[in-house]
Structures are given as C-alpha cells and as structure tokens.
Amino acid sequence: MYVVSTKQMLNNAQRGGYAVPAFNIHNLETMQVVVETAANLHAPVIIAGTPGTFTHAGTENLLALVSAMAKQYHHPLTIHLDHHTKFDDIAQKVRSGVRSVMIDASHLPFAQNISRVKEVVDFCHRFDVSVEAELGQLGGQEDDVQVNEADALYTNPAQAREFAEATGIDSLAVAIGTAHGMYASAPVLDFSRLENIRQWVNLPLVLHGASGLSTKDIQQTIKVGICKINVATELKNAFSQALKNYLTEHPEATDPRDYLQSAKSAMRDVVSKVIADCGCEGRA
C-alpha cells in the first residue's frame, strides 16, 4: 500500500453515495488514532494537515509516517494539504511526495481566485496530484486565519460551474452555512443552495467545518452531493479534554505512553462516529 491522491477516492465516493472523511492530525498519536480506526473499519480516510501542522511536525516526517502506516495496516492513505495558500509552499510539499492539495484563495475576488487556483492546478496535475479549491468563505478560524461569520460568503451556484471549468480543479469546497470551530448553536445549512450547486457542478463537493454537525445534517449533505467531510476541532476537543481529565485525576502521571491513552480513546470515538455518519465503513 502507498500514499495516494484523493481523486479516485472521491470519485468512488460520488458514485457510491457516501463521503470520505478528512481528519486533521497534529502528531504521531493523532495520526495513529485515525489510521488504526480506519484500518479496523476498512474505511477510506484522508489525513489532513494545515500549514501549521506541517510546520509543527515536518513534511518529511509526516510523509514517512503515512507511508509506514499504509504498509503496516495494508491500507491506502492520503495525506492532504488543508487550507494552504502559498504556491511555493505547495510546490515544495508536492515535490516531497504529497499527492493531495487544497489551495485556498477564497478570500480573493472571483477572478483572482480563479487565477491563483489555476496556477496551482497546472503545476499539481503534472505530478498526478489532486487539487481542491474553495468558492465562498466559511466563518470561524483555521490556523491563524479568522473570518467573521457576518462576513462569510455562501457559494454562488452559477459561479461554481464557471470556477470549476476555468480552474480544472478535481473537487470543490462549498460554503453553505458551516463554520470552522464548534457551534454555539445548531447551524442552519442551506440545502437548497447545495442542490443547486450540484446541478451546476459534477465534481465531488467538499464540506468544511463539519465538527459538531448532527448525523442528520451530515447524511443529508451527502445525499445532495457532498463527497468529502472535513473534521478538525471536534477531534482536538475530544483529545485535549480527555487528557486534561486524566491528568486531573492522576496528578502523579508522568509517562506519556500511559496518560495519552485516554486522549486517544476519546478521539477514536469521534473518528468512528464520523466514519459511520459518512457511510464509508467497508469501502476501502
């Protein structure tokens, strides 16, 4: 088994009527949780990292871990650049072996978004690397980028078709009412807008900001055309809260091999639930 691109993975999901979850990881332990759970459930998953994660862990280190785990568990894996914005940064990581990229230029005007994305697509496709881009903006925070929810822009269905055709992307991230981070109250998703986008665009569609969404909402988005579900904050919250609880209850604990187990277990529960919500168990 080896590190693969997301293109075939998402095309299979689109044909099969399920979604592939993209789990944001940060270190060895969080990667172990995702890969072990996916392998046990025979589920396709995407291992995602923001620029901050790649800076923290190191691109070569992450690639080596993914490759080793794919072989160990006989499970195809994808490592994905999540919310990357700089061409040179993306190019360097692609040359190092990354096979899946999200170029996020959604903060730019429409024409500039197209231009920036097309530059990345033209480069990445030379290396058989799949490219995702976003049209519209989500509220909330990703790494150090903050978007006020009042300023978040929903995806225009007609523009989505023009955007997809002009850039040559392999998948499209849409803004339909989700946000990065956890929700203070239940979000109201614009399913009608999503249906219209699907009518205009035949590419696999991506939903960011899925942490905290109900099973009903996730499964409804999949029925309408979402093929990739991104989860980050919910994983961090489960991991960190379980770790805090353990250390509070066991102040004498000093061995990370012991005190990280409860954190991994809590995160594993979230990963298992998201895989079930996405309907991708047994699809790898």
Curated annotation (Swiss-Prot):
Involved pathway(s): Carbohydrate metabolism; D-tagatose 6-phosphate degradation; D-glyceraldehyde 3-phosphate and glycerone phosphate from D-tagatose 6-phosphate: step 2/2
Protein name: D-tagatose-1,6-bisphosphate aldolase subunit GatY
Record-linked InterPro entries: Aldolase_TIM, Class_II_FBP_aldolase, FBA_II, TagBP_ald_KbaY/GatY, TagBP_aldolase_GatY
UniProt-listed Enzyme Commission number(s): 4.1.2.40
GO-annotated biological processes: D-tagatose 6-phosphate catabolic process; galactitol catabolic process
Residues involved in dihydroxyacetone phosphate binding: 181, 209-211, 230-233
Residues annotated as the enzyme's active site: 82
The protein's required cofactors: Zn(2+)
Subunit relationships: Forms a complex with GatZ.
UniProt keyword annotations, A-Z: Galactitol metabolism, Lyase, Metal-binding, Zinc
GO terms for MF: tagatose-bisphosphate aldolase activity; zinc ion binding
